[in-house]
Amino acid sequence: MDQKMINLATEAGAIEIANDKPFVLFGGMNVLESRDLAMSIAEHYVEVTQKLGIPYVFKASFDKANRSSVNSYRGPGMEEGLKIFEEIKRTFNVPLITDVHEVHQCAPVAEVVDIIQLPAFLARQTDLVVAMAKTGAIINVKKPQFLAPHEMRHIVTKFNEAGNDKIILCERGSSFGYNNLVVDMLGMDDMKKTGYPVIFDATHALQRPGGRADSAGGRRAQATELARSGMALGIAGLFIEAHPDPDNAKCDGPCALPLHQLENYLKQMKAVDDLVKSFAPIDTSK
């Protein structure tokens, strides 16, 4: 199937998002903890990606609405979060991605960010899908942990019928028994057969959901190995979250990449991506 390309317009020029183009980094922090920390993390990502020549989109959440515990930190909320996003975009001239959880959030969020993310737990919520589609924004669809990769076509169809075909599909692992996720690499390749760009969330694929009783655990020590495996498939992008002090991050610290490791980590990912995309395709079905 022909591979679709998404053009993300920025003041610095268009970013091409496609499975056969150089990979795009969707990176930042899990949740906005403070304005100063968000600015510092964004600055570091921008410096590293510019140095390495990697197209970049800043990611953070203004509200983590699906935390394990009612007492867990959720974020600053939409109003304050959008102010921080506006400042990041203005200061660093970088495109933005964030997630929405409710229909009423879609329009105001689309006025500020460039890509709206549909959370994995909500990916089959038709009213939310339609509201997101109607913004006309680029949509990043997280694959639910409970859904087979080939079933993503049904979510794509919902967006298409609501008038939006600017879709990115994101793999973030599949449930494997209790408190565990695994990544089906062949399933990710099946998602590519929809024709839409596929990105790999190598951070959340490291989760152990509910593994710490009232929050998710993770396998940060295996962040490099898992990401290299995903990049070897020849995909459109990589989704990662980093933190200067992962052990004290307010959400998903056990999965977060230490921020000081970002440059070395991305050097390896770029090397894998460049190598894989230099190969001529081989049709082994014949």
Swiss-Prot record:
Its EC number is 2.5.1.55. GO terms for molecular function: 3-deoxy-8-phosphooctulonate synthase activity. Disulfide bonds: none annotated. SUPFAM superfamilies: Aldolase. Coiled coil: none annotated. GO terms for biological process: keto-3-deoxy-D-manno-octulosonic acid biosynthetic process. Pathway: Carbohydrate biosynthesis; 3-deoxy-D-manno-octulosonate biosynthesis; 3-deoxy-D-manno-octulosonate from D-ribulose 5-phosphate: step 2/3; Bacterial outer membrane biogenesis; lipopolysaccharide biosynthesis. InterPro entries: Aldolase_TIM (IPR013785), DAHP1/KDSA (IPR006218), KDO8P_synthase (IPR006269). Keywords: Cytoplasm, Lipopolysaccharide biosynthesis, Transferase. It is an enzyme of class 2 (transferase). It comes from the Bacteria. GO terms for cellular component: cytoplasm. It is found in: Cytoplasm. It catalyses: D-arabinose 5-phosphate + phosphoenolpyruvate + H2O = 3-deoxy-alpha-D-manno-2-octulosonate-8-phosphate + phosphate. The keyword Transferase applies. NCBIfam families: KDO8P_synth, PRK05198.1, PRK12457.1. Belongs to the KdsA family. This is 2-dehydro-3-deoxyphosphooctonate aldolase.
